[in-house]
């Protein structure tokens, strides 16, 4: 087994677990498979996590922290104005689906229906992560409106909730139908929701 510092071993377990969950789901990922894939002894797992559920919570918190960081960078310093950056967020997922025929890297899409009825702690971690995404979108909408690069009806937070729910639903439908059309249709609707202001 490779030698890891204490932090590295925990991080390695979480990263390995995330990849396995993206492939098999949370219940489909056995601890034996996780430990074998990560090349970590069983005792080490329980040194860092009191249970598989606690591992799941930590995995989701890690996932959303990284997701929020990437989204923050895109919305704050990506190319173009705030409208361009919000649309780029959605376009990236559509491009990925068109290139690979699947949506990878999103634990919300993969695990939401599976774990929300199984674990209140994991549901709470997922809800907190989703609310973080919505808050970032809300701030970008508010900034875009103040900079006169986009317009929309209602309050930023309310509209961000709609945009997130629309895109999450499109992701799920694309996964079910194995078609990019739900994402394409949703993106077209997003463009109408956050319109370019009339000159």
Swiss-Prot record:
Coiled coil: none annotated. The gene is nemR. Keywords: Disulfide bond, DNA-binding, Repressor, Stress response, Transcription, Transcription regulation. The keyword Repressor applies. One of its GO terms (biological process) is negative regulation of DNA-templated transcription. This is HTH-type transcriptional repressor NemR. InterPro entries: Homeodomain-like_sf, HTH_TetR, Tet_transcr_reg_TetR-rel_C_sf, TetR_C. Cys-21 and Cys-116 form reversible intermolecular disulfide bonds in the presence of reactive electrophilic species (RES). Formation of disulfide bonds leads to dimerization of NemR, which alters DNA binding affinity and NemR activity. Oxidized on Cys-106. Reversible oxidative modification of Cys-106 plays the central role in the sensing of and response to bleach and other RCS. It leads to the formation of a reversible sulfenamide bond between Cys-106 and Lys-175. Oxidation alters DNA binding affinity and NemR activity. The lineage of its organism: Bacteria, Pseudomonadati, Pseudomonadota, Gammaproteobacteria, Enterobacterales. It comes from the Bacteria. Involved in response to both electrophiles and reactive chlorine species (RCS). Represses the transcription of the nemRA-gloA operon by binding to the NemR box. May sense electrophiles, primarily quinones and glyoxals, as redox signals and regulate the redox state by modulating the expression of nemA and gloA. Also uses the oxidation status of HOCl-sensitive cysteine residues to respond to bleach and related RCS. Involved in response to methylglyoxal.
